[in-house]
């Protein structure tokens, strides 16, 4: 792993959060806090997990470091190398693909000028291909940071990226106005009866 810092320690605020997370688990089961602690370490370290951060988490939990590495390398939510300010994760799993994720991938490639696994020269965007993000009913979709952008087409995907490029904050959720995961055409079965009840 290149570009690794020599040390890692949680800052004071995150050290308190780490203690609170560990305290949620019964004595003898503190290792169960490994995933939230890795997330906390990643957030403190600009979106990626250096080896020293994983070693620090292992020390806090009394785990062999290899067990922490196994978790960090298994889940795609952990980044083992530096990423851009905006991590664009495009779902290409079957439901998104059937609903047009190829067009979303193409729009992202065109707008950002990069491909999967790459970061823009200015360090603003990293683009990743990801497996299912769990919002299949609103496919196709992508995740940027902690936000989901759903019911995408190439135009809406491009608009989201352009807004981020200009420093704006695009509205997460459905890009077609759909309410949560209702059918695309609106409610069909659970409609209010006449009289509003």
Where does each model-flagged region fall?
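Signature of N-terminal electron-transfer/Fe-S-associated modules in redox systems
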Residues: 1-197
